[in-house]
């Protein structure tokens, strides 16, 4: 009995020290769930996922290339960082492409309700991808992070469209310079 206890204790110590001595490391709940989400992905033709490390499913990039709307022809890259609290906590999503958009600020923060107060563990990576794609089809000036872009969208849709096109071609809007992001 004592020998069994000491073997269990030794195994615990090895695992906490990072040694696995013949046994493989167990996947966390977040890793299992993200693996399931990735396996069940049903990406629209305008979206693509890129993994820089195929062994790390918790960090990846999403590329959205809208084929209609204000942002048609653009290429927008988002980084996803899935924490160990997933699916109880939403992933951290940032837009890496500087974009003139009411719901994405100039630092890349994204205003999407399912990434904040409306997140539920039943939502998946697929839900977030469709939510992000929808932001490009229907920007929401009612819940803005970029208040200036939201105001222009509400008051002068034509000017908003011109600003979006100028920003995607690469150019200034006011004093802010946008890198070219056309495909």
Swiss-Prot record:
This protein's source sits in the domain of life called Eukaryota
- The EC number(s) given in the record are 2.3.2.34
What is the recorded post-translational modification?
Answer: The acetylation of Met-1 increases affinity for DCUN1D1 by about 2 orders of magnitude and is crucial for NEDD8 transfer to cullins.
List, for all copies, the residue spans of the domain called UBC core: 29-173
Naturally occurring in which organism (per UniProt) = Xenopus laevis
InterPro entries for this protein = Ub_conjugating_enzyme, UBQ-conjugat_E2_core, UBQ-conjugating_AS, UBQ-conjugating_enzyme/RWD
Q: What is this protein called?
A: NEDD8-conjugating enzyme Ubc12
Q: Which SMART domains match?
A: UBCc
Q: Which Pfam families match?
A: UQ_con
Give the positions the UniProt entry annotates as the active site: 111 (glycyl thioester intermediate)
Reactions catalysed: [E1 NEDD8-activating enzyme]-S-[NEDD8 protein]-yl-L-cysteine + [E2 NEDD8-conjugating enzyme]-L-cysteine = [E1 NEDD8-activating enzyme]-L-cysteine + [E2 NEDD8-conjugating enzyme]-S-[NEDD8-protein]-yl-L-cysteine
Q: CDD domains from the xrefs?
A: UBCc_UBE2F_UBE2M
A molecular function (GO) held by this record is: NEDD8 transferase activity
